[in-house]
Amino acid sequence: LQSILDACASGDLDARVAIVVSNHAGVPALQRAALAGVPSAVFTLRTYSDRAAAHSAMATAIAGVGAELVVLAGFDHILAPVFFVRLAGVPVINLHPALLPLFGGRGMHGDKVHEAVLASGATESGCTVHRVHPETVDLGEVVVQRRVPIEPGDTAATLAARVLELEHRAIVDAIRRFVPVEVSR
């Protein structure tokens, strides 16, 4: 989130963060939003009767601020179909810490991804920003990928740190592809 906020503030990205939503209270993204003056909201499953109700409320909040793109970064739920219905026509993208289609799918998040990459003997890893579609996990069209070599002695933590650096640039580059370009005449 911070890289997006910084890119918007510097003018590097001609966009604004309209709202930050989370499915967990107390996460750093909510603190970053508050410091940047961006509204935020939390939609935990404990607060709602089920996943569909939580995701419907989340989509309503996002639509209410006029968002034209939804960016998932650190969001760890599979979005209910109602989310996409409520936000019809609004693209949804996700940041994944591996080179999809490898090392994606259900359960592949956090350190599990980097551990799987290292256990596979892969020579490189990276990150992927991809489109999100209803009831799918890490299967949408790739928007941006960035690569990093696996170094001798890498651990899940050291690899994760290098991939995170790529993620900060990749997400801004991906958002830029959805921002309308103004043509000068």
How should these model regions be labeled?
Residues 16-19, 39, 91:
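Proline-centered loop/turn at the N-terminus of a beta-strand
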Residues 2-6, 31, 56-63, 169-172, ...:
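Amphipathic, non-transmembrane alpha-helical secondary structure
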Residues 34, 63, 118:
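Anion (oxyanion) recognition and catalysis
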Residues 27-48:
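Conserved nucleotide-sugar phosphate-binding/catalytic loop shared by glycosyltransferases and other
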Residues 7, 23, 69, 73-182:
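Donor/substrate-binding cores of folate-linked one-carbon enzymes
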Residues 1-28:
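N-terminal Rossmann-like dinucleotide-binding module
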Residues 42-67, 72:
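Glycine/small-residue-rich loop that forms an oxyanion/phosphate-binding "nest" at active or ligand-binding sites
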